[in-house]
Amino acid sequence: MLFLEVKFLDLDLEANAVIINEEDIKGTAYYSQDRVLIESKTCSFIGTLQSTKTMIKPGEVGVSKYIKDVKLNEGEEVRVRHAQKPQSVSYIRKKMNGQTLTADEIHTIIDEIVSKKLTNVELSAFLVSTYIRGMNTEEIVAMTKRMAETGDTIQWEKRPVVDVHSIGGVPGNKYALLTIPIVAAAGMTIPKTSSRAITSAAGTADVLEVITNVNLSCEEIQRVAKTTGGCLAWGGAVNLAPADDIIINVERPLSIDPQPQLLASVMAKKIATGIDYTVIDIPVGYGVKIKNEKEGNQLARKFIELGELLGIRVECVLTYGGQPIGRAIGPALEIKEALMALHDPKSAPNSLIEKSVSLAGVLLELGGRAQIGQGQKVAWEILESGKALEKFNEIVVEQGGTITKPEEIELGEYTMDIRSPKDGYVTGISNKLITKLAKEAGCPKDKKAGIFLGVKTGNKVNKEDILYTIYSSSEERLDAAVNFARRTYPIKVEGMMLKRLSKF
């Protein structure tokens, strides 16, 4: 056992890591990556031990000042000792071997994720095992319920409360910025909680954060939705299904989104936010999570079945995901395009308008605000009339932002136009490569970074026409993005004659 004094560090240390001078552990049974229990007179937490030669003095233990739910004081003496390996580790190994987990075993895994007893390595093992081995319906139900139970829940006076959610995978998927105000303007309650980017260049929360606050508490979500009918908040700012946000932080560098976790993540948040029914958008196409209509139908069936078991009505919509939605990819570019669509929907990209209006139409029909088959028409009328823009501005102001015009959005100061190498037609836009390109430019952390598409699939182009423009706040990032673009060709241009063959 070690007795050390707390030294706060201005570092966000993952897995509750603690840093100890190597002199304090020399000749002991303590090694880097050991799981340790840190105990004070008032609290305790599990951490991962890291050693240093100079960052921390002998006799001190470095602790992140950003660590949550732990009340320590600078200079306070704490005890550091080995912690027992969590029960979850054996259950994770069981799933790695392809076995089915019981509800109690899944509950233990979720509980230990929330209490941060698992290291990122152990959590990664769990995610990869579910990605490869999968889960049956009973396992997913158990995981979903426990994820919701371990956090806060929101109760509503006015019913029904509706929601729309996209499983993502398509660059520029900014539909919610139009769909939510359309539905709210029709008199329905739609409190939307969104994630930040996981595998994409920008999540809805990243995009809206350019012009308003998205870090709302449960009470603020209720207040905004009660006042305006809707809200657009970051789910990670509240304690709704807290295991989900911990898992997302591990999924992000792995660039994976296991289907069992996808199902549980979406539906746990719906339980926690008190949703009566939801519409799930499932993009289908090359380069997204769901490759074809058959896979889309299978996932939709799982969502609907899971909803029935959880008491939430679910309808799924398969949408075209073969190329980016609209022309803007990246937080600032996307909010600019969404604002332009709200101000003048007739001049906005058809893909953005059609998707936003279609999803809103389904919700309006489910909520009785439009007759079956007329929802899309009613949604378009709300958008065209300016009521959706008015409602969007209400939501923005109520969340702490200011009314912003499209031309007021600042974009990255460093830009580069990528031009067509020849005459021809755009035969394809790679969702994956466009997303990677936007990330090379700095997305999502650099909100001014991104890609603006000058063309879409099927467009005729001449040599030297602009295919797309890269934006970044960093000249170095821009150079990296340009080099990536020239190596990978995210947009393909072909002539009518693809290849000439004479003999083999």
Curated annotation (Swiss-Prot):
One of its GO terms (molecular function) is AMP binding. GO terms for cellular component: cytosol. It comes from the Archaea. The keyword Transferase applies. Its EC number is 2.4.2.57. It catalyses: AMP + phosphate = alpha-D-ribose 1,5-bisphosphate + adenine; CMP + phosphate = cytosine + alpha-D-ribose 1,5-bisphosphate; UMP + phosphate = alpha-D-ribose 1,5-bisphosphate + uracil. The active site is at D257 (proton donor). Pfam families: Glycos_trans_3N (PF02885), Glycos_transf_3 (PF00591), PYNP_C (PF07831). Signal peptide: none annotated. GO terms for biological process: AMP catabolic process; pyrimidine deoxyribonucleoside metabolic process; pyrimidine nucleobase metabolic process. It is an enzyme of class 2 (transferase). AMP binds at G169, S195, R196, A197, I198, T199, S200, T204, S265, K289. SUPFAM superfamilies: Nucleoside phosphorylase/phosphoribosyltransferase catalytic domain, Nucleoside phosphorylase/phosphoribosyltransferase N-terminal domain, Pyrimidine nucleoside phosphorylase C-terminal domain. Keywords: Glycosyltransferase, Transferase. Belongs to the thymidine/pyrimidine-nucleoside phosphorylase family. Type 2 subfamily. Catalyzes the conversion of AMP and phosphate to adenine and ribose 1,5-bisphosphate (R15P). Exhibits phosphorylase activity toward CMP and UMP in addition to AMP. Functions in an archaeal AMP degradation pathway, together with R15P isomerase and RubisCO. This is AMP phosphorylase. It comes from Methanococcus aeolicus (strain ATCC BAA-1280 / DSM 17508 / OCM 812 / Nankai-3).
